[in-house]
Swiss-Prot record:
Record gene name: HLA-H
Domain of life: Eukaryota
Taxonomic lineage: Eukaryota, Metazoa, Chordata, Craniata, Vertebrata
Side of membrane Extracellular, spans: 25-308
Function: Involved in the presentation of foreign antigens to the immune system.
Ranges in the topological domain labelled Cytoplasmic: 333-362
Membrane topology, record value: Single-pass membrane protein
Name recorded for this polypeptide: Putative HLA class I histocompatibility antigen, alpha chain H
Region annotation (Alpha-1) ranges: 25-114
Sections of the chain in a coiled coil: none
Keywords: Cell membrane, Disulfide bond, Glycoprotein, Immunity, Membrane, MHC I, Signal, Transmembrane, Transmembrane helix
One MF annotation (Gene Ontology) recorded for this entry: beta-2-microglobulin binding
Subcellular location: Cell membrane
């Protein structure tokens, strides 16, 4: 695959910020690339989205009438025209690189160009509460399966199959892991710090959850107790059920945290209980926005109803988010540890706000 040339390192990114700014929690920045072939319908579509914590802040779609990287958060509108022009050019160049990667992957897997195929990339880093680098990561997938990933030490690669081994060998020869490590630990962190400062009113807030419990009879003998947490930010939250003080982890139905449509999140956890024993069960809620954990118990007299309108709105947005994620995020999950290792190719670092150019070509 074609390797992107290294770009000039970022010179100035609010240096004083790195020394003086502190945060109450860890933060992350991640970019997701998705490239999808569509035989007979033109060149593959390329989508790039960037997230700081749980907030999407930039997006690029090659299918737009006039493709440009665009802001997806109000605080990104502070960036001037030169920023968006530069990042748009980077996205367009990356789109061409990813399309070439897709063609090369077809050759590696001995596949024809008549079918639909997908190449996905996710990379980013986490920083601690006071700003230091915690960890970096980069994963690549082909047709929804692991292809190659940067190991935790940021010095080596794990390939998922024999085809990926080809990429791994080329990356090792090019010292690609070292390039990625330097980029993720340095320039990438500086961009994250800049965005955290510019968007601090949004990104560093802590909205506590609004909680309540609902009761849903199943039969004369059983009922479902559902513990709700609504309107919270950030997305990290813990809901646990206890019976007489003992955790009911195995018996708890827990949904993934969902966007509510207004920049906050929703979640619920449920247990099935014997009718008449509801008072023995308690729901415990932990979140950054709470001064201390909450404990909820079913109160028959309150009989709260589920806020259908708010939940439906959240589910509608969830559908949109999931749809976007299918084309813009890495959807594969790590398989069991006994999978064969493999390798995958990657690009040189970039000093742009887009993050780094990631080339899967080899």
């Amino acid at each position: 695959m074609v390797l992107m040339a290294p770009r000039t390192l970022l010179l100035l990114l609010s240096g004083a910020l790195a020394l003086t700014q502190t945060w109450a929690r860890s933060h992350s920045m991640r970019y997701f690339y998705t490239t999808m072939s569509r035989p007979g319908a033109g060149e593959p579509r390329f989508i790039s989205v960037g997230y700081v914590d749980d907030t999407q802040f930039v997006r690029f779609d090659s299918d737009d009438a006039s493709p440009r990287e665009e802001p997806r958060a109000p605080w990104m509108e502070r960036e001037g025209p030169k920023y968006w022009d530069r990042n748009t050019q980077i996205c367009k160049a990356q789109a061409q690189t990813e399309r070439e990667n897709l063609r090369i992957a077809l050759r590696y897997y001995n596949q024809s160009e008549g079918g639909s195929h997908t190449m996905q990339v996710m990379y980013g880093c986490d920083v601690g509460p006071d700003g230091p680098f915690l960890r970096g990561y980069e994963q690549h997938a082909y047709d929804g399966k692991d292809y190659i990933a940067l190991n935790e030490d940021l010095r080596s690669w794990t390939a998922a199959d024999m085809a990926a081994q080809i990429t791994k060998r080329k990356w090792e020869a090019a010292r690609r892991a070292e390039q990625r490590r330097v980029y993720l630990e340095g320039e990438f962190v500086e961009w994250l710090r800049r965005y955290l400062e510019n968007g601090k009113e949004t990104l560093q807030r802590a909205d506590p959850p609004k909680t309540h419990m609902t009761h849903h009879p199943i039969s004369d003998h059983e009922a479902t107790l559902r513990c709700w947490a609504l309107g919270f930010y950030p997305a990290e939250i813990t809901l646990t059920w206890q019976r007489d003080g003992e955790d009911q982890t195995q018996d708890t139905e827990l949904v993934e945290t969902r966007p509510a449509g207004d920049g906050t999140f929703q979640k619920w956890a449920a247990v099935v209980v014997p009718s008449g024993e509801e008072q023995r069960y308690t729901c415990h809620v932990q979140h950054e926005g709470l001064p201390e954990p909450l404990t909820l118990r079913w109160e028959p007299s309150s009989q709260p109803t589920v806020p259908i309108v708010g939940i439906v709105a959240g589910l509608v947005l969830l559908v949109a988010v999931v749809t976007g994620a299918v084309v813009a995020a890495v959807m594969w999950r790590k398989k069991s540890s006994d999978r064969k290792g493999g390798s995958y190719s990657q690009a040189a670092s970039s000093n742009s706000a887009q993050g780094s150019d990631v080339s899967l070509t080899a």
